[in-house]
From Swiss-Prot:
This is ATP synthase subunit b, chloroplastic. GO terms for cellular component: chloroplast thylakoid membrane; proton-transporting ATP synthase complex. Belongs to the ATPase B chain family. F(1)F(0) ATP synthase produces ATP from ADP in the presence of a proton or sodium gradient. F-type ATPases consist of two structural domains, F(1) containing the extramembraneous catalytic core and F(0) containing the membrane proton channel, linked together by a central stalk and a peripheral stalk. During catalysis, ATP synthesis in the catalytic domain of F(1) is coupled via a rotary mechanism of the central stalk subunits to proton translocation. Component of the F(0) channel, it forms part of the peripheral stalk, linking F(1) to F(0). In plastids the F-type ATPase is also known as CF(1)CF(0). F-type ATPases have 2 components, F(1) - the catalytic core - and F(0) - the membrane proton channel. F(1) has five subunits: alpha(3), beta(3), gamma(1), delta(1), epsilon(1). F(0) has four main subunits: a(1), b(1), b'(1) and c(10-14). The alpha and beta chains form an alternating ring which encloses part of the gamma chain. F(1) is attached to F(0) by a central stalk formed by the gamma and epsilon chains, while a peripheral stalk is formed by the delta, b and b' chains. It is a single-pass membrane protein. It is found in: Plastid, Chloroplast thylakoid membrane. The chain crosses the membrane at residues 27-49. GO terms for molecular function: proton-transporting ATP synthase activity, rotational mechanism. Keywords: ATP synthesis, CF(0), Chloroplast, Hydrogen ion transport, Ion transport, Membrane, Plastid, Thylakoid, Transmembrane, Transmembrane helix, Transport.
Length: 184
């Protein structure tokens, strides 16, 4: 106990800040207290340190297991992707081989349908031209007929006098009368 009291008393007397030196007094450095503290730390700290190391070990092992599982999943996905790639490459080769003949067939179909469309348009154009020509001819005929009729009426009007006009009307009435008797 005396030792303990002396320790507290000596704590109050610190060496001055200006001095520095080695303390060669073994009893003053208190190696027994230090060894006791180290012994207690080792005895009780071993369990805590062991638990910390075990926890760390478990986390590392679980991380490794997760990594292995992820690696396995990645390898599986890689194999699936390679299989899909092989399948797509085979389909692409098929399309390439079949595609050329399909393209040629489509090209010929397109050329044939374009030729038929052009032929149909040419026929439609010819029919339209014929229709327009016929309409123009009919308009010219109608115009010529109207002009001829107007000239004939003009000639008749200039040649007819009242007496000739009355005789023509009487002759026409007579013809209508005989026609009526024949039909009755």
């Amino acid at each position: 106990m005396q030792n303990l009291t002396d320790s507290f008393v000596s704590l109050g007397h610190w060496p001055s800040a200006g001095s520095f030196g080695f303390n060669t007094d073994i009893l003053a450095t208190n190696p027994i207290n230090l060894s006791v503290v180290l012994g207690v730390l080792i005895f009780f700290g071993k369990g805590v340190l062991s638990d910390l190391l075990d926890n760390r070990k478990q986390r590392i092992l679980s991380t490794i297991r997760n990594s292995e599982e992820l690696r396995g999943g990645a390898i599986e996905q890689l194999e699936k992707a390679r299989a899909r790639l092989r399948k797509v490459e085979m389909e692409a080769d098929e399309f390439r081989v079949n595609g050329y003949s399909e393209i040629e067939r489509e090209k010929l179909n397109l050329i044939n349908s374009t030729y038929k469309n052009l032929e149909r348009l040419e026929n439609y154009k010819n029919e339209t031209i014929q229709f327009e020509q016929q309409r123009a001819i009919n308009q010219v005929r109608q115009r010529v007929f109207q002009q001829a009729l107007q000239r004939a009426l003009g000639t008749l009007n200039s040649c007819l006098n009242n007496e000739l006009h009355l005789r023509t009307i009487s002759a026409n009435i007579g013809m209508f009368g005989t026609m009526k008797e024949i039909t009755d």
